[in-house]
From Swiss-Prot:
Protein name: Probable inorganic carbon transporter subunit DabA 1
High-level lineage: Bacteria, Pseudomonadati, Pseudomonadota, Alphaproteobacteria, Hyphomicrobiales
Protein keywords: Cell inner membrane, Cell membrane, Membrane, Metal-binding, Transport, Zinc
Membrane topology field: Peripheral membrane protein
Protein source organism: Bradyrhizobium sp. (strain ORS 278)
GO cellular component, one term: plasma membrane
InterPro entries: DabA
Cofactor dependence: Zn(2+)
General function of this protein: Part of an energy-coupled inorganic carbon pump.
Subcellular location: Cell inner membrane
Principal location listed in the UniProt entry: membrane
Family stated for the protein in its record: Belongs to the inorganic carbon transporter (TC 9.A.2) DabA family.
Length: 841
């Protein structure tokens, strides 16, 4: 290790260092900005290794807990959730090197003890961690927290997407160069006792990779530990690192490269080095020497045996999951293996596979046996960029795994070009006025005058907002538009050039997309007179994470645009003629309705009813009565989980939560999600799955070459796993993988939230999304996936797709096969091997 006062000689980065930087960055999961916040697997960067190995790695590198406290499992055993047979099965499946007892009784004794002897695995410490552990008073701890605050403050200014009134001058530079430029004038570090901070940064190389190489060399980090060291450094600013990883993801999806995360890593590493050079005392230097010796020890990534406590908790987690799957398979086994009747249904309703839809679908089916519901990804197979009026670009209404293939512009129905221009000009004018007014309210001087002179005028608005009578802010989707115009808004699917870009769909594209969507939904006949294509969204106020309650398959947007596009294309007579040539005959009296399911209030909105033929008015009346009853049943079921059941006004209270700006739990989102079932609805119809199952319609008998099976396993199944693991991470360790206390959130740059007024950007879900204040509402379980298809077909998809194989081989989810008779017959065991399931077990 070079002494701290040696000149900062720039070192040439080696291929090994480049690989270590890339590897550390790949371990970080992306964080989408608030405007299209979607669920992300927080362990995405570790999908190449097993779930068990990842738990060991994260504990070794950063001492992060990835399992529940042992008391949680003890309570599950005490309550009977985990039975002795579940514990025995978990023990039998555990690897020998976990060094666990063979008897359940011995395991129960270990489970009762929170303080077994723990042999700590090697931990790769950063400078900040060593300073914190020494904790010679609060001064050095304060410096490490100060480092995080300063980096976070700088990131909020640099990445700001329009929240701040004053923009950072250096935003035109790349991150590392912009940070060096801003540091030149920043005296905060010196004020905190970090001497010569600006000089130290200036002495280090201007190239960010060379700066990392120099610092790593000067700190004496062992070669084998460099990637772990850099990973740990990123975890200490994990929120902003995750956002930078999102920028990398977005560029890579477009075929580009982005080095923002690597440059942010350089900033963090240089900050750590600045803290390092402040401590020249023997105590710190000795602690650092020991830390680097420990970092040089052989890693234990793939062995839990080095940590007995972790092994015990892991086998208890396995037993907990075995118990859930046992109950799920038993419930599915009790249902008669029904077959679709083949008769024409009165109504068909396609919903998103979202677990919240399961409750509404079950309610509809319980009211009428003539109703057929279908599950499909909520973007309905139309990967579009939807551009609202007055915008140059739009948002991607498709899963984040995909890029939009089509651009669809919003338009006002029945307008001339002059009226279109007038509406556009008026919306832009109103937005400029509001922006100017906002600038006046927030500027350094006028903000004080504004509050003193106009504050009292807002008393009525504050009161009506508090009573949930009015919205606290304008709906951004309709902001600046008149009510008469809002009622005529809709997607325009006709092809035309807008701003030099092709928008809409030509005839060949419409027919091809329509066929692909119908076959992917296993929906080739018979067709009802009314077919609902139901996207979903949510309603809440004062909720930065509102997009997280909208449709993940639509990229964190509501799904009505996709549903209306799909319905319009499927109602096109020329499209239907083309479909008949391809073997799909839609009757002339079938009409597709674009709809939106509000998952907070459970209301269903029907769109474009002016296009409904007069012959279908009675069908519409019957449908509305059905939906009203289904909405009421669904609200009453959700009221129990929301804690308002049993009240005379339970339904109204469910609705009121959507307008209450003090409500931290407007709805439970996807809490409780635990299974994914791809099979005909006949297999699960009549079974109460408790709003915990993703239900995807799939009939392998209609799947030519199993192309739809591949689509399901590579897209919806993967996205469902992301959602499941985000909820898992936010439950087992909300401090590391979640967003903390929603009550304390402050929005930073419109990108994410801080917990309080400082600290790192928060990732994952707020505590209130998984816990009701008394107990966990979400159960931390890896996803149980059940697919009805031949074993050979499922195995072929696994073998041909490395990402899917990593998920199933590394136990990030549990895969089961359903036989042609509708019974769960086999469990996937890794290595393309299946284990038959005893139907009597």
């Amino acid at each position: 290790m070079i002494e701290c006062d040696a000149p900062a000689v720039a070192l040439a980065p080696t291929p090994a260092l480049h690989a270590a930087i890339a590897g550390a960055c790949r371990r970080i999961a992306p964080l989408w900005p608030l405007k299209n916040f979607v669920a992300v697997n927080p362990f995405m960067g570790f999908s190449g290794q097993s779930f068990h190995a990842t738990c060991a790695t994260l504990h070794r590198v950063a001492r992060l807990e990835t399992l529940m406290p042992r008391a949680f499992y003890r309570e599950a055993i005490r309550s009977g959730t985990i039975e002795r047979a579940d514990l025995a099965a978990a023990l039998a499946a555990a690897p020998a090197d976990w060094c666990l007892p063979t008897e359940v009784g011995e395991l129960l004794k270990l489970a009762d003890n929170d303080k077994t002897v723990r042999k700590h695995p090697a931990v790769v410490a950063t400078v900040a961690e060593v300073l914190t552990e020494l904790a010679a008073g609060d001064r050095h701890v304060a410096r490490t927290a100060f480092m995080t605050d300063e980096i976070s403050r700088w990131c909020a200014a640099y990445f700001d997407e329009g929240q701040s009134v004053w923009r950072m001058p250096a935003r035109g530079l790349r991150p590392y160069a912009a940070w060096r430029a801003s540091v030149r004038y920043d005296r905060n570090p010196e004020a905190m006792g970090i001497a010569r901070f600006r000089e130290l940064v200036a002495e280090l190389p201007e190239d960010y990779v060379a700066a990392i190489a120099t610092v790593v060399d000067r700190l004496g980090v062992p070669a084998r530990a460099i990637e772990d060291y850099l990973h740990q450094a990123l975890l200490e600013i994990g929120g902003w690192a995750a956002y930078a990883r999102y920028l990398m993801w977005d560029h890579e999806l477009a075929g580009d490269r982005d080095d923002t995360l690597e440059q942010l890593l350089a900033i963090r590493v240089v900050w750590g080095y600045a803290l390092f050079v402040q401590r020249t005392d023997a105590e710190f230097r000795e602690a650092w020497r020991r830390a680097m010796e420990q970092a040089a020890l052989p890693p234990l990534d793939d062995k839990l045996g080095g940590d007995p406590d972790l092994c015990i908790n892991m086998v208890l987690q396995e037993a907990y999951e075995i118990a859930f799957r046992r109950r799920l398979l038993h419930r599915l086994g009790q249902s008669p293996a029904a077959q679709a009747s083949g008769a024409r249904p009165a109504v068909q309703a396609a919903f998103c596979i979202d677990v919240r839809s399961e409750v509404y679908r079950r309610a509809m089916e319980s009211i009428s046996s003539a109703v057929e519901t279908i599950g499909f990804a909520g973007f309905f197979g139309f990967p579009i960029e939807f551009v609202p009026i007055g915008h140059i670009t739009g948002r991607a209404h498709c899963p984040v795994l995909l890029r939009p293939q089509f651009t669809v512009c919003e338009a006002v129905d029945g307008t001339s070009e002059d009226e279109d221009s007038e509406i556009l000009v008026m919306r832009l004018l109103r937005r400029r006025v509001r922006k100017a007014w906002k600038s006046f309210k927030l500027s350094a001087v006028s903000s004080f005058i504004y509050v003193e002179t106009a504050g009292l005028l807002f008393a009525g608005k504050i009161l009506s907002d508090s009573l949930a009578v009015t919205r606290t802010v304008h709906d951004p989707n309709t902001d600046g538009l008149d009510d008469a115009v809002i009622g005529r808004l809709g997607p325009r699917i006709s092809p035309r050039l807008v701003g030099g870009r092709a928008t809409g769909f030509d005839q060949a594209q419409r027919v091809a997309m329509a066929e692909a969507v119908l076959r992917a939904m296993s929906m080739t006949g018979p067709f009802a007179r009314l077919v609902m294509l139901t996207g979903h969204g949510s309603t809440s106020v004062n909720n930065p994470h509102a997009a997280g309650l909208d449709c993940g398959a639509c990229g964190g947007n509501t799904g009505e645009a996709n549903a209306r596009v799909a319905a319009a294309i499927l109602n096109d007579s020329d499209v239907r003629a083309g479909l008949r040539d391809r073997g799909i005959d839609i009757p002339e009296d079938t009409f597709f309705l674009g709809c939106l399911h509000d998952t907070t209030t459970d209301e269903i909105k029907l769109y474009d009813l002016e296009r409904l033929p007069a012959s279908h008015r009675e069908d519409l009346r019957v449908l509305r009565e059905l939906l009203a009853k289904a909405t009421s049943l669904t609200r009453l079921e959700r009221a129990t989980l929301l804690g308002v059941a049993g009240r005379a006004d339970a339904e109204q209270r469910v609705v009121t939560r959507s307008r209450d700006w003090a409500q931290v739990r407007p709805e439970w989102g996807l809490a409780g999600n635990a299974s994914f079932i791809a099979a005909p609805r006949a297999r699960t119809r009549g079974i109460d799955l408790g709003g915990r199952a993703f239900l995807h319609e799939y009939d392998w008998r209609q799947d030519k070459d199993f192309a739809t099976l591949q689509l399901i396993m590579t897209a919806p199944m993967v996205v469902a796993s992301w959602i499941n693991l985000q909820y898992y991470g936010s439950t087992v360790n909300n401090a590391a993988f979640g967003a903390g206390n929603k009550v304390l959130h402050n929005v930073a740059g419109t990108i994410g939230v801080l917990e309080g007024n400082a600290g790192d950007l928060k990732v994952g879900l707020p505590w209130q999304s998984v816990h009701d204040g008394t107990r966990f509402v979400h159960e931390p379980l890896r996803l149980a996936v059940l697919i009805e298809a031949p074993l050979e077909a499922i195995g072929r998809v696994i073998a041909q797709n490395s990402g899917v194989r990593e998920l199933v081989d590394n136990a990030w989810l549990h895969l089961y096969a359903i036989s042609g008779q509708g019974r769960v017959s086999h469990r996937y065991r890794s290595g393309l091997q299946w284990q038959a399931i005893d139907p009597q077990s």
